[in-house]
Regions:
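Active-site metal-binding loops of divalent metal-dependent hydrolases
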Residues: 10, 169-170, 215-217
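Hydrophobic, aromatic-enriched interface-forming segments
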Residues: 111-157, 166-167
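General small-molecule cofactor/ligand-binding pocket signal
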Residues: 5, 73-75, 212
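Loop-to-helix element that buttresses phosphate recognition and phosphoryl-transfer chemistry
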Residues: 3-5, 10-64, 138-145
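Acidic, low-complexity terminal tails and accessory targeting/binding regions
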Residues: 81-110, 140, 155-162, 177-235
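Generic beta-sheet signal
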Residues: 4, 161-167
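Phosphate-coordination/substrate-recognition cap region in phosphate-metabolizing enzymes
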Residues: 35-117
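Active-site catalytic microenvironments for nucleophilic, acid-base chemistry
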Residues: 36, 61-65, 152, 156, ...
Length: 235
């Protein structure tokens, strides 16, 4: 039996002009995760990530604390959903029937909580819609790319390996939903609760894959409790 760790990137710079960059707190979160892996002898044989800066930087910080050099493979299929494009295409249509989205558009500057409400509406429509929008990647295409990327990682690494995959919430939710046989609106239920730097553990043998743990962030929560600092973040 082999292990696959799906790791959500550390906190990015939400609300700034460069969201993809890790925040100072995000760098600390990634360091805490790297120390956790090192101190508990959680050695990864290979590392994969998307090409986004927040994913690569989180991987680099964690891998830098591993005892041995670990090869880092970058695959754009592990990138986050292009949610800005999803908003751009769907909000003008959905705002006609959603007061929450109407308020979201009118307010302009948004809190994280406001954004989350809008995200749920837009995400669920995108996942369940049969419509094809020009210049917008469909859910079927996105999820298919994610599944193929993961299948290739598993096939390339073989049995008995521990692989770290540094990616984003949408990607992890897509994988977990697929493993559990969940589709449609329910996919969002695995997207919303994912914490920055959380670890989701999958076990695999050949083509068989099972979920061992989801959204584990106790190592960060423990540090937050001891230090009194707010280490736990969703974005």
């Amino acid at each position: 039996m082999a292990e696959l760790y799906l790791i959500r990137h550390a906190q990015a710079s939400f609300g700034t002009s460069d969201y993809d960059r890790l925040s100072p707190l995000g760098c600390r979160q990634a360091g805490v995760l790297g120390e956790y892996f090192r101190d508990y002898a959680l050695h990864v044989d290979a590392v994969n990530s998307g090409e986004l800066e927040r994913q690569r930087k989180t991987a680099n910080i964690v891998v830098g604390l591993q005892p041995d050099n670990v090869h880092h493979e970058i695959d754009p299929r592990l990138n986050e959903i292009e949610i800005d494009k999803v908003f751009e295409h769907l909000v003008p249509q959905l705002v006609k029937t959603s007061s929450n989205l109407e308020n979201f558009v009118k307010e302009g500057k948004h809190s994280s909580k406001d954004y989350q409400k809008a995200l749920e509406i837009v995400f669920k429509h995108w996942v369940t819609s049969d419509n094809d929008y020009p210049n917008l990647q469909s859910w079927a295409e996105y999820s298919g790319n994610v599944h193929r990327a993961l299948a290739e990682i598993v096939a390339n690494e073989g049995s008995g390996k521990t692989v770290g995959v540094f990616t984003s919430g949408g990607t992890i939710a897509t994988v977990v939903a697929h493993v559990l046989g969940v589709t449609g609106n329910q996919v969002y239920n695995f997207y919303e609760p994912l914490m920055n730097c959380s670890v989701t553990r999958l076990l695999y043998s050949g083509e068989k894959m099972s979920l061992s743990s989801f959204n584990d962030h106790l190592f960060i929560q423990s540090l937050a409790s001891k230090s009194g600092e707010g280490f736990l973040t969703y974005r």
